[in-house]
Structure formats: structure tokens, C-alpha cells
Amino acid sequence: MATNTEQQTIIRQAGRSDAASIASIYNHYVAETVVTFDEQPISKEEMARRVEEVQAAALPWLVAEHDDRVVGYAYAAPWKRRAAYRFSVEITVYLDPNYFGRKLGTKLYNELFANLRSTQAHAVIGGIALPNDASVALHEKFGMHKVAVFEEVGFKFNRWIDVGYWERTL
């Protein structure tokens, strides 16, 4: 667990009791942005199921807690289900918009990458709905490089969305 006493931010493993807070953060992005391709809000029960599924795969799901409130999260999930992909993971980070600019994404990814080094993960992949300069910068800060852009693979809010993929190995 990482702490920053100056800002009272703790990075820790998510628990079932965090599901409502995680869903609230995520549902902002569902309703207001194209960074997720979900189009309907998800319930806290569905979010709890997602967290449990990731953790059952022995992968990290972390939350950033500031003053006892979950204000962001990051996790690594299996990249694909077929056996030969078993050493590849996809990483994701979401922040409460009220906490942008506080380097929480960096703190979460620092801890996420540290956690991943103790797993069997080899390839780390990040998918980014484009354009998204902040997310691109965060992923590149962690040594990831662009390997692909899939054009017009998503359609949300009456427009086509490209998705770029960034990758690195551990």
C-alpha cells in the first residue's frame, strides 16, 4: 500500500465495499464521455462482479482514497481469453473529475505496475479512445508506446471513435 500523507491519499486494493464508489466514477464517463464504450450506467452489483472477476484472475484492482473517499481506480484485466494470451493484460485508469491535476493517475499506475511485476504479466496494453492527450501522456510516461490505431471502431454520441493501443513489456 502506498501513502501520501501530505495529500492524505492512499492507494490500496479494492474491496467489495468500494463497488458503489467505483461505479459512480465510471458512470460519469459512461454518461459524459467516449472514453468507455458502455452506453448505459452500471450498477454497484455489476461493478462488484467486475472487480471480483479481475481479482479472481490474480490481477490487481486498486483504488485511490483521499480523505476516506474513493477518488480513482486502476486495474489490469486479462487481455483476451485464449490461452496463449495468458501473459498479456490490459490496464485501465479512471479518476473522479474533481481530482484531475493531482497526479492520481500517476500514483495509481506506479502502484499498478509495481503490483504487475509480481504477477505473470509480460505484455501490458492500454486502449485509449482518441483523441485523449492526457491519457496518451500518462501511458507514455510509463514507457508505453503506440502500436496501433483502430479507426472508427466505436460509435457513441452520434460520432465514430478511433481507439489507439499502447503497449510495453515488463
What is each model feature region?
Residues 9, 69-73, 161:
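Glycine-rich phosphate/pyrophosphate-binding loop shared by adenosine-nucleotide-utilizing enzymes
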Residues 10-22:
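A short beta-loop-alpha structural element at the N-terminal edge
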Residues 23-51:
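Conserved GNAT-fold acetyl-CoA-binding loop/helix
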Residues 41-98, 109-110, 115, 169:
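Acetyl-CoA-dependent GNAT
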Residues 75-78, 125-128, 140, 145-162:
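Conserved catalytic-core motifs of GNAT/GCN5-like acyltransferases
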Residues 100, 126-136:
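Conserved beta-strand-loop-alpha-helix junction that forms the acyl-donor binding cleft
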Residues 101-114, 137-141:
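Conserved acetyl-CoA-binding loop-helix of GNAT-fold acetyltransferases
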Residues 116-128:
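Conserved GNAT acetyl-CoA-binding A-motif
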